[in-house]
Structures are given as structure tokens and as C-alpha cells.
Amino acid sequence: MIVNQGDIYLVNLNPIKGHEQGGYRPVLIIQGDVANKYLNTVIVVPLTSNLEAKYKKGTYFISKEVSGLNFDSIALIFQIRTIDKRRLGKWVSKISKKDSFNVINNLIELL
């Protein structure tokens, strides 16, 4: 399965432990396209419609016009995780390279 950095997919993130983000929700693929081509796993950040989360460090606002979702979203960059590509459900949309770059830069700040 070929996926691209910046793609948004619907995914079931269960099971979870503790404070991990779970449930059936959109995720943003942040893994680079070279790795996406060769690996069976993909690095993602979950999205949430809880706009209060935008005030936390390690988040990034994505408008519904950009995401293709029915609601504005917050990328929970601090909840980064690797999942098997078989978890990926329906493709939703793709964000701009500028937004992808901003998400990656926010991740670098967390590291």
C-alpha cells in the first residue's frame, strides 16, 4: 500500500494504554515518502476535533477546509505513533506541503 506524507486516513487506534489517543479517528501521515514506499508501517499523529487541545505544546491547528474533514482539527503531535499500514482505513484527503512542514517542525521542537 502506497501512502504519502500529508495524507489523512481514518484509523482505529485501539487498543490503547493509559493516556494514548484511541478510537476510530483521522490520523495524519508524517512519515517521509521514501519510507512510506518500502515499509509496512507508517508514522502518524492522531487528529482531534477538541479545539481546546490547540493550546497544548506539540499541537497544530488544521482547518476543515484544509483537512477535508467535517470539522476543524488539532494534530496531536505529542501523540506520535507508528502503526501497521493494515490499520489504515478510508483515505480522507491530503494537507498542503506547507502544513506538513509545519507539523514536522513542531515535532522537531518536541524532540
Language-model features, listed with the residues they occupy:
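Short, charged beta-turn/beta-strand-edge "cap" motif at the junction between a beta-strand
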Residues: 14-18
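Compact nucleic-acid interaction/catalytic patches
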Residues: 22-24, 29-65
